[in-house]
Amino acid sequence: MNQSSFVHLHNHTEYSMLDGAAKITPMFAEVERLQMPAVGMTDHGNMFGASEFYNTAIKAGIKPIIGVEAYIAPGSRFDTRRITWGDPSQKADDVSAGGAYTHLTMVAENAAGLRNLFKLSSLASFEGQLSKWSRMDAELIGEYAEGIIVTTGCPSGEVQTRLRLGHDREALESAAKWREIVGPDNYFLELMDHGLSIEQRVREGLLNIGRKLNIPPLATNDCHYVTRDAVHNHEALLCVQTGKTLSDPNRFKFHGDGYYLKSAAEMRQLWDDEVPGACDSTLLIAERVQSYADVWEPRNRMPVFPVPVGHDQASWLRHEVDAGLKRRFPDGPPNGYVERAAYEIDVICDKGFPAYFLIVADLVNHARSVGIRVGPGRGSAAGSLAAYALGITDIDPIPHGLLFERFLNPERTSMPDIDIDFDDRRRGEMVRYAADKWGHDRVAQVITFGTIKTKAALKDSARIHYGQPGFAMADRITKALPPAIMAKDIPLSGITDPAHERFKEAAEVRSLIETDSDVRIIYQTARGLEGLIRNAGVHACAVILSSEPLTEAIPLWKRPQDGAIITGWDYPACEAIGLLKMDFLGLRNLTIIGDAIENIKTNRGIDLDLESVPLDDQATYELLGRGDTLGVFQLDGGPMRDLLRRMQPTGFEDIVAVLALYRPGPMGMNAHNDYADRKNNRQVIKPIHPELEEPLREILAETYGLIVYQEQIMRIAQKVAGYSLARADILRKAMGKKKREVLEKEFEGFSEGMQANGFSVHAIKALWDIILPFADYAFNKSHAAGYGLISYWTAYLKANFAGEYMAGLLTSVGDDKDKAAVYLADCRKFGITVLPPDVNESVLDFASVGADIRYGLGAVRNVGANVVGSLIKTRNAKGKFADFSDYLNKIDITSCNKKVTESLIKAGAFDSLGHSRKGLFLVHADAVDSVLGTKKAEAIGQFDLFGGTDGGTDAVFTIKVPDDEWEDKHKLALEREMLGLYVSGHPLNGVAHLLAAQVDTAIPTILDGGVSNDTQVRVGGILAAVNRRVNKNGIPWASAQLDDLTGGIEVMFFPHTYSSYGADIIDDAVVLVNAKVVVRDDRIALIANQLVVPDFSNVQEDRPLAVSLLTRQCTFDKVNALKQVLARHPGTSQVHLRLISGDRITTLELDQSLRVTSSPALMGDLKALLGPGCLGD
């Protein structure tokens, strides 16, 4: 090692989040340029970057020295009090963060020391967390000191803090304590020089302690960025952290620009004369540090599955698969099943994975045993018969042509990957079960790192430079960026780099940068921020399991808000060392299915078992063929619904195909339309080559001669080239990677195989030219089949139990009012009336009531789950509410709240009590005040104290409610305010058909993605939530929500348009708008350029349509069918239903949502359903 060199040991990478600005790859490039033999990493309180740092170091050929700048509690780590050592006048010199911590620098000398650092950083989070700091203490470090080198740390260290406070004796005692804990050879006196007074004031005191205790000096540089010119990026990053601007004189900042990787010459110039040996100590430590390779050595850390005596894991797997086949096939498995299961088990055991299958099966079977709904299978695992027998999947792979080799085969070297879908609301229970089963120290969720991406970097940069006005500037810049592709924006460097593939698309934003100096400043700073880690999060589904305590292998942290244990490394780093990663996915549609089944049981008394539902239900395929699949899993979007209408599915294989085809690749080659046209005889099925027509007939028959699935490519290679399915899977992967040299090699073997089977060169080339591009987008049929089954189940529920399914669907969308509006409109189309919330009838969520749906109280603004729970408990215990007075008398103090009561009034939840909404609104505040005092007294037992112990009656209040009522228009506006949409009626009822005649695009069509960016459209509806604003130049503009009967969309009226139409942009105005569609990220909106207020003043309401029905015909199914007929003919005519029972006739006025347009088609539909006499007098 060059003795004139230097090793930087105290460095903060970007994993010191929003404090360190040193990215690891550039850091090693600079260390290499400086010809330094090693470099350290000491991030603040965590070891999140250790894996990336180590692997980057090994690639660069530079020795990694991994450590941590630890937070040390001033007392016990368990003590959450802030402890200071000086008097109040010394606050600036005292323990950091008002008494929270001091610092200590620690690095691992070897693999054992590194594992001890993992334990220390983990336990600091588990036991020493105070606010955002994970703190250790002397006791903990003493327990895990082996293999660790410690220094006195930065100026915030314990020894330096004591010296600044004038506590010289305590400083000496502190240094002696740490020296004793870690050993005299492992303790160093850390010295820094950034020209700061806090460094200079204690230097002589430190050196004196070093001389007295024989502690060698160590020079460090507290690096926070890689090179000197990155100081501005670091200043900007600190402003992102603190929310300050660069112009703020009081912002947190580092003084000077010396916190970078200085050269050896720079460091030795600082220290060699003043403190000889301080730089040499860095080389000494670097030489002492041994390889950490053992920490990253891959090893089998899969949990050992417990099996009965007399079995090993392989034999128990065979036993469980055999038992599973008997459960699946009580009359005995069909021919070939036992043989295939045996083959699969042989492969699983030969690859060493029997425990993995047993673990997954245990998880799935536990979920089912406690009523947690599990998906039927996802990914290639659905191709495994063993998985089907074990209950891991619920789709039999053999009749669907699914291949085990696509999932696992003798040639595969990596772990199989079985992902599991659970009911979204109960995923957390499964994580807890895994921890209970395998040990809480051996199971953890997985960390993710949120980085500062392109748009965020621009917005952060604009704010820190220009404050509040910067938001508008950033908006202008981000709107000029080219559209994101697959949710990824162009990197900022690509905007000005002609070599970047999207350079030409960035001309607009590049022009801004070149012509506007403010934009150029924002851009330059943003480039320094882009890509830096902003925060740590938790992966949505990944869970790590281990056979040993996880802290033996990786660092962990405890999420403060909920105590969840999280890995300190992302899942690829965990998998690389042999830890088992599983995905526990929360699937919302399983929650919807579960709610729908519960609704069916409650509403109809039917216990529905979806697994037993036949896959040939006619009503389901009729629904699919109509494209009535809003809310159906994977089939919800507008273009998908159009494809279903073209395709007219008639069997489950069509559903599987549509999921595989509706993706950019196949659609780009028009394969989706080709499939639909060939299925419906609109296109001739052509063979790939005459020689191949017969050999490939069976393989391609199900997809009408098209290659749709990866499994088909594998079967083709097996059939015509003599490949094994394992080798065919290797071919499939090679084709997907598109590497020329690999493809040439594969084509050679493929061609030889086909020639050996008698195929001509022309046939070989024709087939290769077809399967090569198809391999790039051909879909995994196993995954499509598993998800296709969920699609079928949800379609089946909607087709056969529409009310119950839609209630579950509406509950699932929660606060997404745009989705709720679309689904409510779909309910009307299906003849389902959505009833408003009701204090006497509603529960928390949407609920099916006969053929209708009742709004849940939990969907009312300002009404939380606790209030609803209290209200329902009261209703169950004391009976339904007779009137508003009875309601106030019965409810407990939880529900007795003016804001809650007002919200329920506006939402119409008291309508059934016979009061007007306005009347209740006028008296509710005084009424609540009147009863509140009594209820508070009841709650603390005062009535008992003053003579109420004999069980006397409660105090009773009577409130007189005025009869005054708001106009319908105002009632509906308030209803929308509370519910986010109109429920009991709609301001457009009676004129919607007139409005629809003047538009060219429906709002749901835009929201479904059926209209591309920048398209001009004409839409109509009613304005709501009008928000008038002023831009940075003081010019007014507005935004609003435009609602029609089917949905709502945001419309922006920018200054030019606003200046012409501002007077008409008011709440509740019915308008027609010409606008441009704007698609940005996941947000779709309209930019208006013209507005028209149509005149409907002379519209005459059509004469009511009278429909007669015998009371004995009033069955659930008949009424539901009638609603569907009426919903198919929307219009302005009221419908009167005449119920005939003998001589008695009862006339009901149907809901406004069921108004119709009288037409011969409607009359024919009614007569077909109810008989020819239904329209007579």
Curated annotation (Swiss-Prot):
Its EC number is 2.7.7.7. GO terms for biological process: DNA replication. It is an enzyme of class 2 (transferase). GO terms for cellular component: cytoplasm. It is found in: Cytoplasm. Disulfide bonds: none annotated. This is DNA polymerase III subunit alpha. The lineage of its organism: Bacteria, Bacillati, Actinomycetota, Actinomycetes, Mycobacteriales.
